[in-house]
């Protein structure tokens, strides 16, 4: 990869649960996982089922066997692929896992509980890879060294009700990408999300619901911790970002509906695009 470039690739774009099948084949059916690669580092955001294919790809690539995984929160659709992540089963690999600080129980304990024998045959402590789990504070930063260092700012937000969510801003070679999944934005955008994303080159934003799903009927989704496509576009406009990538699509939305929602987003923020499985976006030096 050319120096100063970083690449965004989507390995899973669904929220709530995977949605495989012909009706979702164009957009993709795997749950949340985004890779951001610089010339020196592999960064992964969330570990839904998309991380399974990513893991298979990583072990085939040349380069250092090191990966950094940043978790937004611990709902199942964001961690369900971690147990099947190929690098975790190789002693050659070093896997750093980051997430929101939790004192009782700790982040490590919570992840270990998903791999007890009641739920899975291999425990966290039995994985052959060298795994380091780090809890992040509400306003934290991770520096990844290199010829051009990469910085990951972490910001805890209450935009996901009840448990909260970690937002991440990745900065490399003067460019930045913001990862803001599982946020529920009122009209004009959730204030701390908009402030955190201000001026970013790319904003990856939750866009799970239609207006009707969010507001209407006896099963409206208000308070469930996700945005409508309209909310995502309004947040991008308020933050003045370069490009909006709509993410965390509802598993009930087929390819045609996601494309229709993409068109709606563009009427509010023209530089909007629906994230699809396999989509690559390159951010290049100025």
Predicted segment positions?
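Binuclear metal-dependent hydrolase catalytic cores
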Residues: 1-178, 188, 258-285
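Cap/insert and terminal regions of metallo-dependent hydrolase folds
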Residues: 176, 184-278
